[in-house]
Amino acid sequence: MRIVVLAGGIGGARFLRGLQRAAPDADITVIGNTGDDIHLFGLKVCPDLDTVMYTLGGGINEEQGWGRADETFHLKEELAAYGVGPEWFGLGDRDFATHIVRTQMLGAGYPLSAVTQALCDRWKPGVRLIPMSDDRIETHVAVDMDGERKAVHFQEYWVRLRASVPAVAVVPVGAEQAKPAPGVLEAIAEADVVLFPPSNPVVSVGTILAVPGIREAIAEAGVPVVGLSPIVGDAPVRGMADKVLAAVGVESTAAAVAEHYGSGLLDGWLVDTVDASVVERVEAAGIRCRAVPLMMTDLDATAQMAREALALAEEVRTP
């Protein structure tokens, strides 16, 4: 079975680990979000791609869900001693090595997709990890701050400001002019099923869908497209998805997120058992819906979520 997954960072990576357990023989292609990418200290940092790579490759800091295990921060301390920032973004020494290799390869003319493949040669994540685009795309957030409206990089909004100021718009800068990376459209066309993990629907999955051609390819693939709600009991399972959902005019409910994706894209939608009352509303929108446990408490629970998603895909496939 060929499965395509549109993945952001922590939520997407953890779901993928469960999917590998649930479908060990599947051929999995991950289309990774690059809207979170940022240039720091002269280096190209790809947080979501790296989180997927480290998580599936066994190098992730399990407790925080991002960054490397057994990390040290000597480089960060030395930069701070020179008065060089930003101090709010925590790059560790091991992590720096990844960004140095990536930046060197990009500087030598390799596209991001080829660089990502080279980095994965070390980590062996067990999936094919492709960035959504080789073109530079950065998500910016328009915020009202200090009495004025300004645009900040998504990482500054998320990490430094902790989404504490009102967001009025979320814009994937560069997406309109971007092209899908080599292999992205082909993977979608050859897929047996497409999955949207419980990643952020605006700044993770939504950013991937903003690259011209990707949304259309999924809608036209003619295979089941199943998503899992990142909202449980009217609140994000993790992160601050409610803040960016509000910025695009979507309420923080499992049903509203399904409607945001729409029946033109989604065939099936999983909500948590606490949201069982919305199943009827989602189905009225033309999307098959089931209520199952959606908390990724451990690998077994996550694998069961993946099994439920694949089962719903089969249900949708067989009228």
UniProtKB/Swiss-Prot annotation:
Pathway(s) annotated for this protein in UniProt: Cofactor biosynthesis; coenzyme F420 biosynthesis
Subunit structure: Homodimer.
EC assignment: 2.7.8.28
Keyword Mitochondrion set for record: no
Taxonomic superkingdom: Bacteria
Coiled coil regions, renumbered to chain: none
Phylogenetic placement of the source organism: Bacteria, Bacillati, Actinomycetota, Actinomycetes, Kitasatosporales
Family note: Belongs to the CofD family.
InterPro entries the record matches: CofD (IPR002882), CofD-like_dom_sf (IPR038136), FbiA/CofD (IPR010115)
Protein task: Catalyzes the transfer of the phosphoenolpyruvate moiety from enoylpyruvoyl-2-diphospho-5'-guanosine (EPPG) to 7,8-didemethyl-8-hydroxy-5-deazariboflavin (FO) with the formation of dehydro coenzyme F420-0 and GMP.
One Pfam family hit: CofD
Single annotated GO MF: magnesium ion binding
Catalytic activity: enolpyruvoyl-2-diphospho-5'-guanosine + 7,8-didemethyl-8-hydroxy-5-deazariboflavin = dehydro coenzyme F420-0 + GMP + H(+)
Protein name in the entry: Phosphoenolpyruvate transferase
GO BP terms, alphabetized: F420-0 metabolic process
Protein keywords: Magnesium, Transferase
Cofactor: Mg(2+)
Record: residues binding 7,8-didemethyl-8-hydroxy-5-deazariboflavin: D50
Record's keyword annotation contains Magnesium: yes
